[in-house]
Curated annotation (Swiss-Prot):
<comment type="similarity">
    <text>Belongs to the TMEM144 family.</text>
</comment>
<dbReference type="GO" id="GO:0015144">
    <property type="term" value="F:carbohydrate transmembrane transporter activity"/>
</dbReference>
<feature type="transmembrane region" description="Helical">
    <location>
        <begin position="307"/>
        <end position="327"/>
    </location>
</feature>
<feature type="transmembrane region" description="Helical">
    <location>
        <begin position="60"/>
        <end position="79"/>
    </location>
</feature>
<feature type="transmembrane region" description="Helical">
    <location>
        <begin position="244"/>
        <end position="264"/>
    </location>
</feature>
<dbReference type="GO" id="GO:0016020">
    <property type="term" value="C:membrane"/>
</dbReference>
<dbReference type="InterPro" id="IPR012435">
    <property type="entry name" value="TMEM144"/>
</dbReference>
<feature type="transmembrane region" description="Helical">
    <location>
        <begin position="122"/>
        <end position="142"/>
    </location>
</feature>
<keyword id="KW-1133">Transmembrane helix</keyword>
<dbReference type="InterPro" id="IPR010651">
    <property type="entry name" value="Sugar_transport"/>
</dbReference>
<feature type="transmembrane region" description="Helical">
    <location>
        <begin position="211"/>
        <end position="231"/>
    </location>
</feature>
<feature type="transmembrane region" description="Helical">
    <location>
        <begin position="35"/>
        <end position="55"/>
    </location>
</feature>
<keyword id="KW-0472">Membrane</keyword>
<feature type="transmembrane region" description="Helical">
    <location>
        <begin position="86"/>
        <end position="108"/>
    </location>
</feature>
<feature type="transmembrane region" description="Helical">
    <location>
        <begin position="6"/>
        <end position="26"/>
    </location>
</feature>
<keyword id="KW-0812">Transmembrane</keyword>
<dbReference type="Pfam" id="PF07857">
    <property type="entry name" value="TMEM144"/>
</dbReference>
Length: 358
């Protein structure tokens, strides 16, 4: 029989590889306000759940699993206002830190009813955890070279700027008979490539927008950090059960939460913003994310929250950074590469020390 620790380390490696790569398919495609993207992505995760159910030949459908998936989705919904208020750089730093800290402390101190995890070398465990947090902080000082993509050069199924213009009547439906030819000519001429109205988050004055962004980032990280708690509680009552048995209900929670939000959004915003060319990349991104989360679930169950979760959550930063350096060329210059190297050293040391502390 394979050692559970070995399985846990393999799970952490899978999580690191696929979490670090799951947004690569949509990198060069428009995502708009992100709601359609996250819903299609959740469909991809559900496909992974069915595959896991087929492999394990056993599954449960526990309300606690739905809760776990919903907690993750709540954290993910915060990403849109975070990016609008404080940007992806600071936001990513804050939610990564709060996620790793929350997950580590949850297992270390037995929060939310989880059994406290005991390790052979507590001092090494703390040092490894501190190294991973330090690595995340170092990542913040990297200044990427990012070429902004103009999402208005893409055509959504119905552009936001069409709302209220000719072609959309007062009830929000397409007045095809009256303005079809007019609308087609405007679309071909680029008349609909107007700047959409700024969101409520972008209109907030400083420092309120910054405060909101920071609060949402920390909250989002906490949701990411506790989304595995229901699975851990279930595992404590089903010691011999496979983590693959829990995947379906957990991912169903993600799918149902995203579906509910997208339906409400589609009712309120008529018509919703959907980019056809982004649908398949979003679905593929969901497949990669689903595989990654299965790896994290395996790592967390076999290594515990204080080891498996930080390893599976910190490792993706290495992979995503390598994509940025060698493929997208976003991280350039001696200074940035030196900071990245220091981050890698701290992250690698932290993961290694965590493994040794077990």
């Amino acid at each position: 029989m394979v050692n559970p620790q070995v399985i846990g380390y393999i799970g952490a490696a899978v999580a690191s590889l696929f979490f670090g790569s799951n947004y690569v398919p949509v990198k060069n495609y428009p995502t708009g306000n992100g709601l359609a993207f996250t819903w299609v992505m959740s469909v991809g995760t559900l496909v992974v759940a069915y595959c896991a159910m087929f492999i394990s030949k056993d599954y449960i459908f526990d309300p606690w699993g739905l809760l776990g998936g919903t907690l993750w989705s709540i954290g993910n919904f915060c990403v849109i206002p975070i990016v609008k208020t404080i940007g992806i750089g600071l936001g990513l730093l804050l939610w990564c830190c709060s996620s790793i800290i929350t997950g580590y402390f949850t297992g270390k101190f037995g929060w939310f009813g989880i059994d406290k995890q005991k390790v052979s070398h507590p001092a090494l465990n703390w040092i490894g955890f501190a190294c991973i947090v330090a690595a995340v902080i170092f990542f913040f000082f990297i200044e990427p070279t990012i070429e902004e993509k103009d999402e208005h050069s893409y055509s959504s199924i119905v552009d936001d700027s069409e709302i209220g213009n000719n072609g959309i009547d007062n009830n929000g439906y397409n007045s095809i008979n009256n303005n079809n030819n007019n609308g087609n000519n405007k679309r071909r001429s680029g008349a609909f490539n107007k700047q959409p109205k700024k969101s409520i988050f972008e209109r907030m004055p400083p420092p309120y927008n910054t405060i909101l962004g920071i609060v949402l980032s920390v909250f989002s990280g906490i949701m990411y950090g506790v989304n595995m708690v229901p699975m851990q509680l279930w595992k404590q009552s089903n010691v011999d059960a496979s983590p693959l048995s829990f995947v379906f209900c957990h991912f169903s929670g993600i799918f149902l939460a995203n579906t509910a939000v997208f339906i409400v959004y589609s009712i309120i915003v008529r018509p919703p913003q959907i980019f056809p060319q982004t649908i398949f990349p979003s679905f593929f991104s969901g497949l990669l994310w689903g595989i990654a989360n299965v790896g994290l679930m395996v790592a967390t169950q076999n290594l515990g929250y204080t080891i498996g979760f930080p390893m599976g959550s910190g490792g993706p930063m290495i992979v995503s950074s390598l994509w940025s350096v060698f493929y997208f060329r976003e991280i350039q210059g001696v200074k940035n590469l030196l900071i990245l190297l220091i981050s890698f050293i701290f992250l690698g040391a932290g993961i290694t020390i965590l493994a040794l502390s077990h």
